[in-house]
A protein has these predicted regions:
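Short, His- and charge-rich active-site/binding loops that engage polyanionic ligands
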Residues: 1-66
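Domain-level detector of nuclease and nuclease-like folds
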Residues: 40, 47-158
């Protein structure tokens, strides 16, 4: 989670992951299949109470979707618990559904295919924000989260 993104000690919390990193092996790629999605996204109650992390309601009626940083079906091959643990707001960034179900999804499938072809890949994913087009969701008096305008994903072979 981002607690102070510009390292100037002003304590700006963005409420989204700075990045996620994980290894995806050939035998773990579920080919887009995953376990049943829970009806609500979980959060860390302590971080939410402190105004550092969002909760499921932060996205409600925002017009934005919760974009997984670690793809749900990437984790599905690691087991039901890993699959379920991707369904937390600590693993999500607000984004337009057009991006989430479009280029973002295509990149997630591409890295899964690379894991099949190469045997394993390390994946590092993080949000990109631009000042000019920054939109926010959440509670003005609690925690505002920026809507990402892009993402960076690096995949490297073992």
């Amino acid at each position: 989670m981002s607690f102070d993104t510009d390292q100037d000690a002003d304590g700006i919390a963005l409420g989204v992951p700075d990045w996620v990193a994980y290894e995806l092996r050939r035998d773990e790629w579920a080919g887009g299949k995953s376990h049943k999605r829970p009806s609500r996204w979980s959060t860390d109650p302590d971080l939410h109470q402190r105004g550092i992390a969002p909760d499921d309601s932060s996205y409600r009626n925002s017009g934005y979707s919760r974009g997984h940083m670690c793809m749900k079906s990437h984790a599905a091959g690691m087991g039901a618990a890993a699959d379920r643990e991707t369904h937390t707001v600590l693993n999500a960034c607000p984004q337009m559904q057009r991006m989430n179900g479009g280029i973002w999804l295509a990149i997630e499938y591409l890295t899964g295919r690379w894991a099949n072809e190469q045997g394993a890949v390390w994946i590092v994913t993080g949000p990109v924000f631009t000042e000019a087009s920054r939109n926010w969701i959440g509670d003005l008096y609690r925690l505002l989260m920026p809507v990402l305008t892009g993402s960076e994903e690096v995949a490297a072979r073992r």
